[in-house]
């Protein structure tokens, strides 16, 4: 399952605190990118962004995010990919059937 994990720095969080926490967790993970981390995106302007994390176990997701919860807040949602052409075809059929 893919999880969209929007994050926002807490009010008094500093760039130094975030950098330190990320490096601590990176080193704790053996200096490697976590296999479950599929994407890391920052919003323009800084202080917010989102992670894409793939795991079938929500407890694993929680364990991944918890070390950061004193410097950022998370808004987490399960997501899935949509095949654009297939979805358009389904919606066209729905419109034609009047549903």
Describe each model-derived feature in a short phrase.
Residues 1-99:
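Conserved, structured core segments of small domains
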